[in-house]
C-alpha cells in the first residue's frame, strides 16, 4: 500500500516543541493559531498530490517515501516526461510527429540501478493516471517478466486511483492485459519478446531488457530473433505518433540497440540515447569525472571496480 502522510488533527493541543508560534512577514507579525495547523497540513497534502500528478519522481516519492533517487533517475525522468508530453501533443494535434525527437529513446544502464522500477513500473502508472486514453505495451525478454510488470503496474494503479481520479476496470484481473473504467479497451498490454501482441496500437511501448544476460546475448540466433520481432511485431503495433523506449543493459554490440542504431545510420528511425555506465568513461551525460560511480549512494567506485575485476 502507498505510504502517504496523513493529516492529523492537533486541535486543542499545545504546539509541538520546535514549532513556531508566530509567522513573520516583513515588519508585520501575525499570531499562528494552533487550530490552523490541520488546515495547513491539509494544504501541504494537496500540494504534494498536485506535484505528484505533474511530475514522475514526485509521484514515485509520494507513493513510496523510502524511494532513493539518484541523479541518473532525474535525467531519465526528465526524458520520460518529454516523451509522453510529445505523444500527447501529437495526439491532440499540437505537434507533428516529424517535429519530435523524443519518440525513439534508448536508455543504457547497468543492472540493479533502478531502471525497471522507474521506466516499466512507475512511469506507465503515472502516465496512464494522467492520460487514461493511452495504450501501453510492456515487454521484456520473457513473458513471465513482462506479466510481472503488468501485475505490478495494475496493483500500483489500484493504490493510485484516488490520486488520479480513475478506477480499474472490473475485468482487470489479467496481469498481461488490463485497463481503466471507460478507457474503451485501452490500457496495459504485456508480452515477452518474440510473443504475439494484439489489440489497439500502443501510444508508448517499453522494451525492458530484450535479452536476458551475456550468455544469451552471445547467441546470434537470439539477437536476430529479438531484432526481427521488433521489426515485424512491436513496431507494427504502434499507434500513429507512438513512442518506443528501449531500456537495457548492453551485453553485445550487435544486440537490438546496436542493430537499430546501425539502421539509423542508414536513414531509419532516429534514436535519442542516454548512455549511463556504472563507472563514467570519457564524456558523460551526467557530467561525471572518469571513473565516477553512477549511483554512489548505493554502489560506490570501490565496490564497482571489485565487481569489474571479478
Write out the residue ranges for each language-model feature.
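Conserved nucleotide-state-sensing and coupling region of NTP-binding domains
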Residues: 139-197
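Conserved P-loop
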Residues: 108-164
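Alpha-helical scaffold elements adjacent to nucleotide-binding pockets in ATP/GTP-utilizing enzyme cores
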Residues: 148-156, 201, 205, 233, ...
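Residue-level preference for the first positions of well-ordered beta-strands
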Residues: 104-106, 135-137, 187, 204, ...
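Conserved RecA-like ASCE ATPase "motif II neighborhood" in helicase/translocase motors
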Residues: 176-230
Amino acid at each position: 500500500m502507498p505510504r502517504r502522510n496523513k493529516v492529523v488533527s492537533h486541535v486543542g493541543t499545545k504546539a509541538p516543541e520546535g514549532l513556531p508560534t508566530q509567522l513573520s512577514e516583513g515588519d508585520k507579525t501575525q499570531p499562528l493559531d494552533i487550530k490552523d495547523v490541520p488546515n495547513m497540513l491539509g494544504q501541504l497534502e494537496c500540494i504534494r498530490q498536485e506535484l505528484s500528478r505533474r511530475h514522475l519522481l514526485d509521484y514515485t516519492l509520494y507513493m513510496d517515501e523510502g524511494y532513493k533517487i539518484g541523479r541518473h533517475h532525474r535525467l531519465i525522468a526528465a526524458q520520460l516526461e518529454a516523451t509522453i508530453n510529445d505523444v500527447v501533443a501529437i495526439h491532440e494535434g499540437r505537434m507533428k510527429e516529424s517535429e519530435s525527437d523524443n519518440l525513439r529513446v534508448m536508455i543504457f544502464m547497468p543492472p540493479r540501478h533502478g531502471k525497471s522500477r522507474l521506466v516499466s513500473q512507475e512511469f506507465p502508472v503515472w502516465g496512464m493516471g494522467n492520460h487514461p486514453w493511452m495504450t501501453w505495451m510492456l515487454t521484456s525478454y520473457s513473458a513471465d517478466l513482462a506479466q510481472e510488470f503488468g501485475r505490478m503496474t495494475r496493483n500500483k494503479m489500484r493504490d493510485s486511483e484516488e490520486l488520479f481520479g480513475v478506477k480499474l476496470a472490473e475485468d482487470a484481473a489479467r496481469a498481461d492485459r488490463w485497463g481503466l473504467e471507460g478507457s474503451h479497451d485501452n490500457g496495459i498490454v504485456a508480452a515477452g519478446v518474440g510473443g504475439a501482441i494484439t489489440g489497439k496500437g500502443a501510444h508508448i511501448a517499453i522494451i525492458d531488457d530484450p535479452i536476458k544476460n551475456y550468455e544469451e546475448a552471445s547467441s546470434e540466433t537470439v539477437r536476430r530473433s529479438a531484432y526481427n520481432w521488433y521489426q515485424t511485431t512491436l513496431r507494427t503495433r504502434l499507434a500513429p505518433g507512438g513512442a518506443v523506449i528501449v531500456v537495457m543493459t548492453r551485453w553485445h554490440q550487435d544486440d537490438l540497440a546496436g542493430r537499430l542504431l546501425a539502421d539509423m545510420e542508414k536513414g531509419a528511425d532516429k534514436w535519442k540515447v542516454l548512455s549511463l555506465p556504472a563507472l563514467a568513461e570519457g564524456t558523460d551525460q551526467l557530467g561525471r569525472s572518469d571513473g565516477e560511480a553512477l549511483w554512489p549512494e548505493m554502489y560506490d567506485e570501490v565496490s564497482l571496480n571489485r565487481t569489474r575485476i571479478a
